[in-house]
């Protein structure tokens, strides 16, 4: 199991793939899939069974959060397409895709702890 927002981490000779945000800017379904397949293929070659990715959020609501580049877009349709095609590509390469960072991730602080405070009416709207 490896963290993988832009490819395999924690081993030698890894590729670094374009961020989710950069990939989403193309609006190209095939590119989402091919990026996922390439990430999955590299992971499989290194003996990795699960990639922690693709990244569904942050939604881009908090610019100072610093993790907006990991997700695809604040647009839910584009993010859904990105998650679906990327996950399919990763899994077609024989590796389990584990989507991560859902609601509230970008407004967290003290990220080594547990729990993110959010306003209930905001969370319900998301």
Question: Residues of each region from the PLM?
Answer:
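Glycoside hydrolase catalytic-domain context in secreted enzymes
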Residues: 1-126
């Amino acid at each position: 199991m490896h963290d993988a927002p832009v490819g395999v981490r924690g081993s030698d000779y890894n590729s670094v793939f374009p961020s989710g945000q950069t990939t989403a800017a193309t609006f190209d379904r095939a590119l989402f899939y091919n990026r996922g397949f390439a990430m999955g293929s590299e992971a499989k070659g290194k003996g990795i069974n699960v990639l922690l990715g693709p990244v569904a959020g942050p939604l881009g609501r908090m610019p100072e959060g610093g993790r907006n580049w990991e997700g695809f877009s604040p647009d839910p349709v584009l993010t859904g397409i990105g998650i679906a095609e990327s996950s399919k590509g990763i899994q077609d390469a024989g590796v389990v895709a584990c989507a991560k960072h859902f609601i509230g991730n970008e407004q967290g602080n003290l990220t080594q702890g547990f729990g993110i405070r959010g306003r209930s009416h905001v969370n319900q709207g998301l």
